[in-house]
């Protein structure tokens, strides 16, 4: 694996492969990799001739009260993991490489980006969409890989690609989980031992929603209330968002009919906010074709 910081150098290296007709897969990350990231790499490695991973802690997606400096970083460890995963190129630019001057051009999806996490992190998804667009412009991948754990981010990127006719296929990869069901996340390292034990309640909240919907509850507010109460039984858990949404548009759902619904959870443990989600097919939808 070759580590490159320069945009020009990466473009030159990839141009040779592109001329040879090789497909390129991109795995964008902010580093401090875990097994979830490596599942993205595994998928990319199996579906492309050339795999590029990027590590860039993007200042545009951090708000004024979010500590960019404290975001965990360990480039040597990440390089070792990516090498073992079969990555061909690691693009690891500095801020001066990506943003040599203050950014005037911003990619913003104001409707999708102001919902849910965007409502409490204004500008966050504009920062994400802008840096992902810039990475797409630099790498020009055939496919790009993102985890389904950050479902809102994934849908924003999909819509951005569609609206801007960007020539890349966005591949969503199912969430990788730890032994107790907690979604793998770089944020998990911030949890204390007690908070980590308590965090096992989060995936159980998804199970509770599935149980309620499977039992015939069709009122979305009742499901959201039931899951909130379930999560609140854990003293260290502070549910911030328990929301049933349309999986494609992220618009609120009031009644659960035959279409699948998306449950999004944002639960805080101390200073750490954990995200999780599940697309749930109502019982009537699951068995509609059995006849």
UniProtKB/Swiss-Prot annotation:
It catalyses: (R)-pantoate + beta-alanine + ATP = (R)-pantothenate + AMP + diphosphate + H(+). GO terms for cellular component: cytosol. Keywords: ATP-binding, Cytoplasm, Ligase, Nucleotide-binding, Pantothenate biosynthesis. GO terms for biological process: pantothenate biosynthetic process. Gene3D superfamilies: HUPs, Pantoate-beta-alanine ligase, C-terminal domain. (R)-pantoate binds at residues 61, 153. The active site is at residue 37. Catalyzes the condensation of pantoate with beta-alanine in an ATP-dependent reaction via a pantoyl-adenylate intermediate. This is Pantothenate synthetase. The lineage of its organism: Bacteria, Pseudomonadati, Pseudomonadota, Alphaproteobacteria, Hyphomicrobiales.
């Amino acid at each position: 694996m070759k580590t490159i910081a320069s945009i020009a150098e990466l473009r030159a290296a990839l141009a040779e492969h592109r001329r040879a007709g090789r497909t390129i897969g991109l795995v964008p990350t902010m580093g401090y990799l875990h097994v979830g990231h490596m599942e993205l790499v595994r998928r990319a490695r199996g579906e492309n001739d050339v795999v590029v991973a990027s590590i860039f802690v993007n200042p545009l997606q951090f708000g004024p009260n979010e500590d960019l400096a404290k975001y965990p970083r360990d480039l040597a460890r990440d390089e070792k993991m990516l090498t073992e995963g079969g990555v061909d190129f690691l693009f690891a630019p500095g801020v001066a490489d990506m943003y040599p001057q203050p950014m005037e051009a911003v990619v913003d999806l104001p409707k999708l980006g102001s919902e849910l996490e965007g409502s409490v992190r204004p500008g966050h998804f504009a920062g994400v969409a802008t840096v992902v667009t810039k990475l797409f412009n630099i790498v020009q991948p055939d496919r790009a890989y993102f985890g389904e754990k950050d479902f809102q981010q994934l849908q924003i990127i999909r819509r951005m690609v569609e609206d801007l006719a960007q020539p890349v296929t966005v591949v969503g990869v199912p969430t990788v989980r730890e032994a107790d069901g907690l979604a793998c996340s770089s944020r998990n390292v911030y949890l204390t031992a007690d908070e980590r034990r308590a965090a096992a309640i989060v995936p159980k909240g998804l199970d509770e929603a599935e149980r309620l919907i499977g039992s015939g509850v069709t009122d979305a507010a009742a499901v959201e209330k039931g899951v909130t109460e379930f999560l609140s039984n854990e003293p260290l858990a502070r549910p911030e968002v328990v929301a049933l949404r349309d999986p494609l548009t992220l618009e609120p759902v009031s009644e659960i009919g035959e279409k699948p619904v998306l449950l999004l959870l944002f639960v805080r443990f101390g200073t750490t906010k954990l995200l999780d989600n599940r697309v749930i097919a109502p019982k009537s939808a699951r068995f509609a074709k059995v006849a």
